[in-house]
Swiss-Prot record:
The lineage of its organism: Viruses, Riboviria, Orthornavirae, Duplornaviricota, Vidaverviricetes. It is found in: Virion membrane. It comes from Pseudomonas phage phi6 (Bacteriophage phi-6). It comes from the Viruses. One of its GO terms (cellular component) is membrane. This is Protein P13. Keywords: Membrane, Viral envelope protein, Virion. Its main location: virion.
Amino acid sequence: MVPLKISTLESQLQPLVKLVATETPGALVAYARGLSSADRSRLYRLLRSLEQAIPKLSSAVVSATTLAARGL
């Protein structure tokens, strides 16, 4: 397991989460067009990785919620 500093992770991912949650697909494409080719590739790889991880994240949220409810 990779050790994570949660506060750093949250602050780094929050702008991406807000961008994806609030923008239309067309706006995201327009945003990506304004990036350098290298950054567009990085963004694409990151979004693909997140897309594959979302199902696992969903079950992790359920587990974390259960642990929090139990006070663990």
